[in-house]
């Protein structure tokens, strides 16, 4: 038995049998075939190469028989020479076919990975924000990597392995029965003895491998959470480096110990298979040798049978696990399809309308909103923990919200924490659709526009501005990829951040670090504003955008807002008195309702909640 055969048998026997009893819907199989359709020609060629490889593998032992019986035994040197040349030619042909087979299987597998990964990535990006608030990032990345690769194996390792082994076993058995049915039957009697150690060690290796994967996942999770700026800062602030090192060391030592056990189990596995194969070969030599002595078969036939026997046990054992192999691949497909079948909460209309030209008004009309439940927006298998609904899921958080902001007007939202201000902003950016009522820009319901058009017209700066671990220029061009350096500089000047960028050694090419942590809060905010100005939306949303700025930074941002927001409709969650005083209307939000509205002076004169908020939050300003 060759090492390649032993390794293929090992891979098959160590598949996770937890999937054996799973039932996969027929629709899943049909769907897989649809993914395979673009590769049907390549798959056909791949199968032809498998058949060719099997035939060439069987042909070589038959030529051994000829070279012994018809060449060496009778002293025919010419036949020996030409048969040896033929054997060499078959070996070269077998190797060439193996390369061709591998090339085509790689084309199939890598093409499938590309198709699935790009489709899953695009689909996930279209999910609502609620999906990401519930989903464990590591589990989602696993779907994009591990499960997609597992699905790919259905067309490479599993498809090639199952069909290749089936073809090999069939061709080898036909050849062996044709040479000697007695020796062939004796060899098959040993098959159960061959399967027993493989199955036992396979189960043992499965358990150890699952334990190792769990331990590695725990270590990976610890590193992911600690090896970012926020996690590292928390560890340092609480003086926990030694404790963290001890925790990691404990997990690493368990991985070390399990690795040693797996190595020994592997050794026992290969030893058992090799011993059983050697026993089968010994029996074949013993029985076949006596048949040669009796004249029932020739010496060449015996040698050919031994060579064929070496090709039989590995594929035969692997085929005994065909259900595990196939189900493992199908379950991987099913897990990928589970993500693809999750419908986005916000969808584009079949017949979208166009955004009108000119200034855009913003209007909320009788809007009620309830945050979706986990079953509506997420997958329990991606959440990492037992599903628990958030405080607001399934409960109304906005009630009969109605207001209108004229083109170019500034509307300020004020109110206590949890009143519903951020929810109003999320609806305006169409992160969600209202449960009832409508949200309109330019008189058109957002649900009648494509999400691309909404995002092009509505620009948002959140309280915690997110920057990618890239250069300042790349972060700015996220808003407009085709922007020139001149465009970037103008946007930065409008955001009062160019002087700072110009003072940096690398200027616009300065890398901002993970989430922009190399910059101060005020610098991040102003770069985010520059990105907004570069986008040049007609509706601007500032979600507590100046909450982290010092007085000088706020002054500079206010100067930028005064000029950059002219002619644009603005909705601001206000935390600064200067913003409130500039507002054309102020909406006081409490418990999901607009309880007061008017200008700063009007609301102060009217008393009520606004006056209370003003006295407690803004009076010192």
Model regions: which residues?
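Membrane-integrated ABC transporters
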Residues: 1-57, 72-86, 101-105, 122, ...
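Cytoplasmic coupling helices
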Residues: 2-4, 103-122, 136, 160-164, ...
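Short intracellular "coupling" helices and adjacent cytoplasmic loop segments at the cytosolic face
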Residues: 12-20, 110, 118-142, 146-148, ...
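Juxtamembrane helix-loop junctions of ABC transporter transmembrane domains
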Residues: 17-25, 48-49, 56-69, 90-137, ...
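An intracellular "coupling" helix at the cytosolic face of ABC transporter transmembrane type-1 domains
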Residues: 33, 41, 129-130, 146-155, ...
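Transmembrane helices of ABC transporter permease
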Residues: 38, 42-55, 157-211, 284-297
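Helix-loop-helix
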Residues: 72-82, 175-189, 261-334, 339-340
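ABC-type nucleotide-binding domain
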Residues: 356-621
């Amino acid at each position: 038995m060759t090492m390649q055969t032993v390794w293929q048998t090992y891979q098959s026997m160590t598949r996770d049998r937890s999937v054996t009893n799973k039932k996969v819907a027929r629709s899943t199989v049909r769907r897989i075939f649809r993914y395979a359709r673009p590769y049907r020609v390549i798959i056909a060629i791949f199968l032809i190469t498998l058949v060719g490889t099997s035939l060439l593998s069987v042909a070589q032992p038959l030529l051994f028989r000829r070279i012994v019986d018809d060449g060496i035994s009778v002293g025919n040197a010419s036949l020996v020479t030409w048969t040896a040349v033929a054997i060499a030619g078959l070996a070269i042909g077998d190797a060439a076919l193996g390369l061709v087979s591998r090339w085509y299987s790689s084309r199939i597998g890598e093409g499938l990975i590309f198709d699935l990964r790009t489709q899953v990535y695009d689909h996930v990006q279209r999910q609502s924000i609620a999906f990401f608030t519930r989903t464990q990032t590591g589990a989602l990345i696993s779907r994009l990597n591990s499960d997609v690769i597992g699905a790919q194996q259905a067309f490479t390792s599993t498809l090639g392995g199952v069909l290749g082994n089936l073809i090999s076993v069939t061709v080898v058995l036909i050849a062996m029965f044709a040479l000697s049915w007695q020796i062939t039957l004796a060899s098959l009697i040993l098959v159960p003895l061959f399967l027993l150690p493989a199955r036992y060690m396979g189960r043992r290796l499965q358990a150890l491998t699952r334990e190792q994967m769990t331990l590695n996942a725990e270590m990976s999770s610890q590193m992911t959470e600690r090896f970012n700026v926020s996690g590292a800062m928390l560890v340092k602030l609480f003086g926990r480096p030694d404790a963290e090192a001890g925790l990691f060391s404990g997990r690493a030592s368990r991985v070390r110990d399990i690795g040693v056990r797996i190595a020994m189990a592997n050794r026992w596995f290969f030893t058992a298979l090799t011993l059983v194969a050697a026993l089968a070969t010994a029996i074949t030599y013993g029985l076949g040798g006596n048949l040669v002595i009796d004249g029932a078969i020739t010496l060449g036939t015996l040698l050919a049978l031994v060579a064929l026997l070496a090709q039989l046990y590995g594929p035969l054992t692997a085929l005994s696990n065909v259900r595990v192999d196939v189900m493992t691949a199908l379950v991987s497909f099913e897990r990928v399809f589970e993500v693809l079948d999750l419908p986005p909460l916000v969808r584009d209309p079949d017949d979208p309308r166009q955004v009108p030209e000119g200034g855009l008004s913003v209007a909320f009309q009788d809007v009620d909103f309830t945050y979706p439940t986990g079953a509506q927006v997420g997958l329990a298998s991606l959440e990492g923990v037992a599903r628990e609904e958030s405080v607001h899921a399934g409960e109304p958080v906005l009630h009969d919200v109605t207001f209108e902001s004229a083109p170019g007007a500034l509307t300020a939202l004020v109110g206590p924490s949890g009143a519903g201000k951020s929810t109003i902003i999320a609806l305006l950016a169409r992160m969600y659709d209202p449960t009832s009522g409508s949200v309109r820009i330019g008189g058109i319901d957002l649900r009648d526009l494509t999400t691309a058009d909404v995002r092009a017209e509505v620009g948002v700066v959140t309280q915690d501005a997110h920057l990618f671990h890239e250069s300042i220029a790349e972060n700015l061009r996220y808003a407009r990829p085709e922007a020139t350096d001149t465009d970037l500089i103008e946007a930065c000047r409008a955001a009062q951040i160019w002087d700072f960028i110009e003072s940096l050694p690398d200027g616009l090419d300065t890398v901002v670090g993970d989430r922009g942590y190399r910059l101060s809060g005020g610098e991040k905010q102003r770069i985010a504003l520059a990105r907004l100005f570069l986008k040049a939306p007609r509706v601007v949303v500032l979600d507590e955008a100046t909450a982290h700025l010092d007085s000088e930074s706020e002054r500079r941002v206010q100067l930028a807002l005064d000029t950059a927001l002219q002619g644009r409709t603005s909705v601001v969650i206000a935390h600064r008195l200067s913003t409130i005083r500039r507002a054309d209307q102020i909406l006081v939000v409490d418990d999901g309702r607009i309880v007061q509205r008017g200008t700063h002076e009007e609301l102060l004169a009217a008393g009520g909640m606004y006056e209370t908020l003003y006295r407690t939050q803004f009076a010192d300003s």
